[in-house]
Amino acid sequence: MALRFFNDISRDVNGLFNRDFFHTNPLSLNISTTTENGVNFTLKAKQGVTEGPIQTSVEGRFYDRKEGVSLSQSWSNQNRLNTRIEFSKIAPGWKGDVNAFLTPQSIKNAKFNLSYAQKSFAARTSIDILQPKDFVGSVTLGHRGFVGGTDIAYDTAAGLCARYAMSIGYLAREYSFILSTNNRQCATASFFQNVNRYLQVGTKATLQSKTSSNMNIEFVTRYVPDSISQVKAKIADSGLTTLSYKRNLNKDISLGVGMSFNALQLTEPVHKFGWSLSFSP
C-alpha cells in the first residue's frame, strides 16, 4: 500500500473531528445520480445562516477507467466555474491533475499538481500556471509505521520560504499518533483509535504560542450501533459541545441532524442546529 501524502498523515483523526457534523449549515441538500454511460451528476445546496441565501452548485464528472482520465466541471449560483482534469495512470505511482477556477471578478487560476507515491515515499508538487508566484511541495517518508513529512511553499518572486509545516508520528491499523508544527508557531498533538467495530475515539491538543500560552484540548467519539446509523459527539475544554446523528433511511437516502452549544454558558445565544438530506439513486 502506498504511503500517505503529507496532507493525509492526520487523515484519521481529522476525519473523525470534521466529518458528519451538520450544525454549520441550517439546511444542506445533496443529490447525486449516475447515467448509463458512467457520467455522474451532483447537485449541492446549502444555507450558510438562518434566513440567509442558499448556495447551490451542480457538477458533472466522467471517468474513463481504461485510460485513467477523469473530467469534472462544476458551476455555482455565484458564477464560479471549476474545471478539473485528472490523470491517474501516467506511470506506476504517478498521478497528475489540472484544476482551473474562473469567477466574474476576473479571478482566474489554473493549478497543476503532480504526485508520486510508493510504500515508503510520497511526494507532491503544485504550481499555478497562470500566476506562477508560489511553488508548493511536500515530501513524506515512512518505515514500519513511523512516518514523517514536510510541506513548503516557496515564493519564487521574493526568493524566500512563504510557509512551512512538519509532522511526525506513528500509523497503525487500529490507532495513530501525530505531532505537527508550522511557521505560525502552532503545534498540534493528536491521537486516534479504533476501539472496536462500534466505537472510534480521538483527541487533539493545540498550542498557538504566538497568540496564547493556553493549550486547547478537544475530544471526539463516533459510535456505530448498527449498519445504518451513527452517533458522534465532540467537546472542547472551552465548553463547546457538538452532537450529530446520521441514519440511512434506505439504500439511496440518508438524513443527518446536528447541533452545537456551549455547555459552560447555556444561557448564551450561541446554539446552532442544522440538518442534511442526501439522495444517491
UniProtKB/Swiss-Prot annotation:
Keywords: ATP-binding, Ion transport, Lipid transport, Membrane, Mitochondrion, Mitochondrion outer membrane, Nucleotide-binding, Porin, Transmembrane, Transmembrane beta strand, Transport. Belongs to the eukaryotic mitochondrial porin family. It holds the Pfam family Porin_3. PROSITE patterns: EUKARYOTIC_PORIN. It is found in: Mitochondrion outer membrane. Gene3D superfamilies: Porin. CDD domains: Porin3_VDAC. It comes from Saccharomyces cerevisiae (strain ATCC 204508 / S288c). GO terms for cellular component: mitochondrial outer membrane; mitochondrion; pore complex. It comes from the Eukaryota. The lineage of its organism: Eukaryota, Fungi, Dikarya, Ascomycota, Saccharomycotina. This is Non-selective voltage-gated ion channel 2. InterPro entries: Porin_dom_sf (IPR023614), Porin_Euk (IPR001925), Porin_Euk/Tom40 (IPR027246). One of its GO terms (molecular function) is ATP binding. Non-selective voltage-gated ion channel that mediates the transport of anions and cations through the mitochondrion outer membrane. The channel adopts an open conformation at low or zero membrane potential and a closed conformation at potentials above 30-40 mV. The open state has a weak anion selectivity whereas the closed state is cation-selective. Does not confer permeability to NADH. Catalyzes the scrambling of phospholipids across the outer mitochondrial membrane; the mechanism is unrelated to channel activity and is capable of translocating both anionic and zwitterionic phospholipids. The gene is POR2. ATP binds at residues 11, 19. GO terms for biological process: cell redox homeostasis; DNA transport; lipid transport. Its main location: mitochondrion.
